[in-house]
Structures are given as structure tokens and as C-alpha cells.
From Swiss-Prot:
InterPro entries: Aa-tRNA-synt_II, aa-tRNA-synth_II, aa-tRNA-synth_II/BPL/LPL, Lys-tRNA-ligase_II, Lys-tRNA-ligase_II_N, Lys-tRNA-synth_II_C, NA-bd_OB-fold, NA-bd_OB_tRNA. GO terms for molecular function: ATP binding; lysine-tRNA ligase activity; magnesium ion binding; tRNA binding. Binds 3 Mg(2+) ions per subunit. Gene3D superfamilies: Bira Bifunctional Protein, Domain 2, Nucleic acid-binding proteins. Keywords: Aminoacyl-tRNA synthetase, ATP-binding, Cytoplasm, Ligase, Magnesium, Metal-binding, Nucleotide-binding, Protein biosynthesis. This is Lysine--tRNA ligase. It is found in: Cytoplasm. One of its GO terms (biological process) is lysyl-tRNA aminoacylation. Mg(2+) 1 binds at residues 418, 425. The gene is lysS. Homodimer. It catalyses: tRNA(Lys) + L-lysine + ATP = L-lysyl-tRNA(Lys) + AMP + diphosphate. The keyword Isomerase does not apply. Its cofactor is Mg(2+).
Length: 509
């Protein structure tokens, strides 16, 4: 059945206010009858026994003749009316749609009148036996019927569904009613979260919950949201990352932990950024960043196979292969590979990169920017969007990796990776810094950057440093953006398409 047919109705083309008034009048009639009979106009006693998709699956191999020649199979279904042609209706439940056949000869006149007066969007209960039409559609031959919920507003646009993007985001419930693709997107999201949870649990990780409000924002370089605790009369910050709490748990002996939860960053909104977003963050003791790259490859490949049935994932006209192993290249080499005008000496020259950032990238170079910071800017501006197929970028500068362990052979870089696909960062992981003295010094450097005007630099967290002083075993940690991963699997162009209720500007009036 097409979207157009599903939205058809016999209602005349009149204003929405008039349609609403008509529905209120119908509700008044229902209430009057309910009062006379002692029944509720909003009944709540019907118990559904069958779902549309289950019935479609159960009878998919049975022809019209086979169904008619067998003993009747009686069912009880419920759902929202999406089509009402008098002789048959279509209802929609959480699994899909099924037709209801209205036998004009077998139903009382008052029941037929009630069915005729149903509006699209009304929620009904139906009982009857299974049949199949000459066109091959499965239906329920209606023998019993009850209006459960009267819809007082008409569904959006009768023939074209809900196409206004802003309305889709503001009124997601309507989007879910009329757009099957939207429902599929959020079913994929649920499978992604469940799949990650199952994978990590199977690897002996323990799921935990850590605070959402922090005394000191930390765990990432980002601008936080600030709030105030009235009873304690103190400022608090919505968390930008759970990292510092999760590592405390590893200190405490929980050697494999993960958390799936929200982070909040008071930054810009775009097709890939929302101020409130979902992350999976996990930590594994006695592992390094290379172990987590391997784990990530295995987990993403399994998710793609389990959810989509393939490792070749189509996204916005491209096809990304989730079949591991993925490409691995250092940030230094990635800059060279994507900027053929550079020599290795150029990429290692602070003054050369500072001039390039100022003159070619048209970005400010602050006095405190070191070589690592400038390399990171050049990478972000000239390389990131070119990383189409799954790629691990490794060996990030220590200057821009305040929580990562320094590389044993080169202290100016860290044992860190970021994972990119489709030109977007999807994950960030590293061997954790477990030297409390080095960590304290890096926090102090971050404070200096904050004092110099960098709003995203980290605060000094003395309590975390104290926890490290008790001893953090060799550990690796990683965070993966759930929303961006769902975008890939659902072929969604914007992060707002995969968040049920994305943040919007306040609607005037």
C-alpha cells in the first residue's frame, strides 16, 4: 500500500479548525452515549492478543483458498486508523499495518454507522477471523469493534505525509505515525544500543552509571552547561564526558566498565552536532589503544551484520565497508598524504604551520599554540572530510591529548587514535595516562590555556589526580558517538534525524 493511499480520506477539503470542531462534536456524541449506558468514553479494558506484523508473517505462505478452506483463526488486534473506506479499513500498530474487512451484511447497522464515522487517527480495537482478499492482502474479517481513543486532531497532510522538516522534529509523534522510514530509523537505533551492550557484556565489561552533574567539568575539551544546586548553594556542570569517573572505577578494581548515556556540550548545532548527545564510553585494564582498535573493528563489523545483514553500508550515495581490518595511519602521515605541497620538514615546523593556518586557513593563531596544536588544526581542516572509508588516525600530539599516555619512543605524541568514516569522527580512544605527576602537569597546562582564553580547555581536577596516586593499572579507554553511528546505519543525513526530540529554537508565539 502506498503512502498516498494510506493517507487518503473521504473528508472534504476544509480548514483544520473546522475538522477539529467536527471531531469534538463526535466526541461529545460519544460522551453522551457513554453517560447513558454507564460506559467510559475512553475504555481501557481491551486486551490485544495479536500484532499486525506477526499475523503477516504467520500467514505469508497461505493463499486465499487455503485460508478459506481451513478452520477460522480468530484474532484480537488494535491500532490507529490510517484508512477508512467503509468496506475496509487499515490500522497501524507498533509492528506494521493490517486491513480490517467490514462485512455490511454481518454487522449491526449502528456498528456500521460508527465505523463510517471514524476519523483517521482514531484508535480502535477489533476482533474477527483471518482472511485474504482477491488482491492478496491479509485482513481481519471484522466481528467485533470498539473505539478506544477518539483523535481530536487530523493527521498531517492527507496525501504527502509529513514533509516539513521542522515540524517533524518538533512533533516527532506525528512523524512516527505517518512516516514508516522514521520508525525504522529509531528501531535501528534501539538495535545499535542493544547490540553494543550485548557485545561488551559478552566481553566481560560491566555496565555502570556515573554522575550527570559535575563539580568540575572534565573528560573532554568542550564548553559545559552550567547550573546551580540551590540546597548546596554551589555551581554544577552538566557532564561533557564520564571519563574521569569511569577511570576512578578502574582504580577501584572494576577492570572492564562501560556506560551508555548522555553528554552535554554548550556548542554549535549542525547536521552532526547536538548539544545533548549519546555516547558509549568503555575502559579496559591491562590493554592498550591497539587492543581497542581491534575491539572496535570486531564490534562494528558484528553490528553491521546483525542489524543490516551486510558489512557494505550504503550512506548518502556512498558505500562504506565495515569489514575489518580498517586503515591505520598517523596524523603526521595523513597530513602529508592529503597535502602533497607539504614536506615532512614542513609538518614538523611550527612557524611554517602557523603561517599556513593564518594565511591559507584564515584562522587565528594564539601565542600559546604549539606545534601539536597547529598540526591538529591543519589535520582537522584539510584531512578529516577526505577520510571516507573507515580509518584510524593514530599518534595524536600530546599537546591536544591531555588525558592520553605519551608514546614510549616519542614523548611529543600519544598512544591515541580517532576513528573516522564518511569524513566524520565516530570514536576517540587511547592508552590512558596513569602517571599522576604527568597528569597534574598536563592539567596545569590546560589551566594556562584556559586563562589565555581557550574556553574548551580543561579544569584542574585535584580529586582525579589523587585517585591516580592510588594506582591506575595500564588501561585503555574509548568513546563512540551513538548518534553518528546510527546515522550511518540508518542512512540519515542529519543527527536530528536519529534523535527522537532534538533541540530546537523556541517557537515564537
Amino acid at each position: 500500500m502506498t503512502q498516498q493511499n494510506a493517507q487518503s480520506t473521504s473528508e472534504p477539503t476544509i480548514s483544520e479548525n473546522d475538522l477539529i470542531a467536527q471531531r469534538h462534536a463526535k466526541l461529545k456524541q460519544i460522551q453522551d452515549v457513554a453517560k447513558e449506558t454507564g460506559k467510559s468514553p475512553w475504555p481501557n479494558t481491551f486486551k490485544r492478543e495479536h500484532y499486525a506484523a506477526d499475523l503477516q508473517e504467520q500467514f505469508k505462505d497461505q493463499s486465499k483458498e487455503q485460508i478459506e478452506s481451513a478452520e477460522h483463526v480468530y484474532v484480537k488486534v488494535a491500532g490507529r486508523v490510517m484508512l477508512n473506506r467503509g468496506s475496509f479499513m487499515v490500522i497501524q500498530d507498533m509492528t506494521g499495518r493490517i486491513q480490517l474487512y467490514v462485512d455490511r451484511k454481518g454487522l449491526p447497522k449502528d456498528t456500521l454507522e460508527t465505523i463510517k464515522g471514524l476519523d483517521l487517527g482514531d484508535i480502535i480495537a477489533a476482533e474477527g477471523y483471518i482472511g485474504r482478499s482477491g488482491k492478496g492482502d491479509l485482513y481481519v474479517h471484522l466481528e467485533g469493534f470498539e473505539l478506544l481513543t477518539k483523535s481530536l486532531r487530523p493527521l498531517p497532510d492527507k496525501f504527502h505525509g509529513l514533509n516539513d522538516t521542522e515540524v517533524k522534529y518538533r512533533k516527532r509523534y506525528l512523524d512516527l505515525i505517518v512516516n514508516e522510514e522514521t520508525r525504522k530509523t529509531f528501531e535501528i537505533r534501539a538495535k545499535v544500543v542493544a547490540g553494543i551492550r550485548a557485545f561488551l557484556t559478552n566481553e566481560r565489561f560491566m555496565e555502570v552509571e556515573t554522575p550527570m552533574m559535575h563539580v568540575i567539568p572534565g573528560g573532554a575539551s568542550a564548553r559545559p552547561f552550567e547550573t546551580h544546586h540551590n540546597a548546596l548553594d554551589m555551581p554544577l556542570f552538566l557532564r561533557i564526558a564520564p571519563e574521569l569517573y569511569l577511570k576512578r572505577l578502574v582504580v577501584g578494581g572494576f577492570e572492564r566498565v562501560f556506560e551508555i548515556n548522555r553528554n552535554f556540550r554548550n556548542e554549535g548545532v549542525s547536521t552532526r552536532h547536538n548539544p545533548e548527545f549519546t555516547m558509549i564510553e568503555f575502559y579496559q585494564a591491562y590493554a592498550d589503544y591497539k587492543d581497542l582498535m581491534a575491539l572496535t573493528e570486531n564490534m562494528l563489523e558484528k553490528l553491521a551484520l546483525d542489524i543490516l545483514g551486510t558489512t557494505d553500508v550504503p550512506y548518502q550515495g556512498e558505500v562504506f565497508s565495515f569489514k575489518g581490518p580498517f586503515k591505520k595511519i598517523s596524523m603526521f602521515d595523513a597530513i602529508l598524504e592529503n597535502n602533497p605541497q607539504f614536506t615532512p620538514e614542513n609538518v614538523g615546523d611550527r612557524e611554517f604551520l602557523a603561517k599556513f593556518v593564518r594565511e591559507e586557513l584564515k584562522e587565528e593563531v594564539k601565542p600559546g599554540f604549539g606545534l601539536g596544536k597547529l598540526q591538529t588544526i591543519v589535520f582537522e581542516e584539510t584531512v578529516e572530510t577526505k577520510l571516507r572509508q573507515p580509518t584510524f588516525i593514530t599518534e595524536y600530539p600530546a599537546e591536544t591529548s591531555p588525558l592520553a599516555r605519551r608514546n614510549d619512543d616519542n614523548p611529543h605524541i600519544t598512544d591515541r587514535f580517532e576513528f573516522f568514516i564518511g569524513g566524520r569522527e565516530l570514536a576517540n580512544g587511547f592508552s590512558e595516562l596513569n602517571d599522576p605527576i604527568d597528569q597534574a602537569e598536563r592539567f596545569q597546562a590546560q589551566v594556562a590555556e584556559k586563562d589565555a582564553g581557550d574556553d574548551e580547555a580543561m579544569h584542574y581536577d585535584a580529586e582525579f589526580v589523587e585517585a591516580l596516586e592510588y594506582g591506575l593499572p595500564p588501561t585503555a579507554g574509548e568513546g563512540i558517538g551513538i548518534d553518528r553511528l546510527v546515522m550511518l546505519f540508518a542512512d540519515a543525513p542529519s543527527i536530528r534525524d536519529v534523535i527522537l526530540f532534538p533541540h530546537m529554537r523556541r517557537k515564537e508565539g
